[in-house]
Amino acid sequence: PTYTAEGTEFPLTVPEGAFLVLCGPSGCGKSTLLRQLKPALAPHGVRQGRILFRDAPLEQVDQRTQAARIGFVQQSPENQIVTDKVWHELAFGLESLGTDTPTIRRRVAEMAAFFGIEDWFYRDVAELSGGQKQLLNLASVMAMQPDVLILDEPTSQLDPIAASDFLAVLGKINRELGTAVVLTEHRLEEAFPLATAVAVMDRGRLLCTGTPQQVGRQLKTLGHGMFLAMPAAMRIWASVDT
């Protein structure tokens, strides 16, 4: 598996190539959990249990591997961009890892084509829309070819059209590149069709996990309020007796 979190409150595994949607009420700990999966962003404090990355304790994974293999996209498009040119932003992570120039050029070209960035490749980052900036963040992370891509409410500051386009690109990444995706997202109607697995949190604990269909059934059986927040198609499916 790509990730395994072990503990009395949170037993969860993310297999390679999975698309996991993590959901739950506001303040239940989703962002805190995601940051535990990226040590450079993890909050300070005492952690119980274990987090494994490719069957190795996460704290024993060297920083270079963490930087390259664990991608993270934050909520605000502004918080992650560090250069002033689109092309340089695509190359920055690879430069920081000491990647050779021919490889940087090849990967940047591949990402520009994959994400449709060619038309604004040489533009200033300041000229981009919020949707373009977030797409650039995503492309910059993917240039390092991560094994897992973690996204914390990446569309929260995007307009509906840009958000739909962004989520469609995530589905393409998962299908065509086989990258595991762990996503928290409030637009569940659009995120759930992409999911191979769903995990629901409540008050810092894992409430239930499984396929979208299984989670719908579990929430209905539990009578939990999160059932009403699920996409309409899931609620209808879970309510039909079999």
Report residues per predicted region.
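H-loop/switch region of ABC-family ATPase nucleotide-binding domains
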Residues: 185-186
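Catalytic Walker B motif of ABC-type/P-loop ATPase nucleotide-binding domains
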Residues: 149-152
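Conserved beta-strand-loop-alpha-helix hinge in the C-terminal portion
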Residues: 205-229, 233
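Conserved ABC transporter NBD signature motif
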Residues: 46-56
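Conserved ABC ATPase signature
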Residues: 124-128
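Conserved ABC ATPase "signature" region
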Residues: 102-120
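ABC ATPase NBD coupling module
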Residues: 57-71
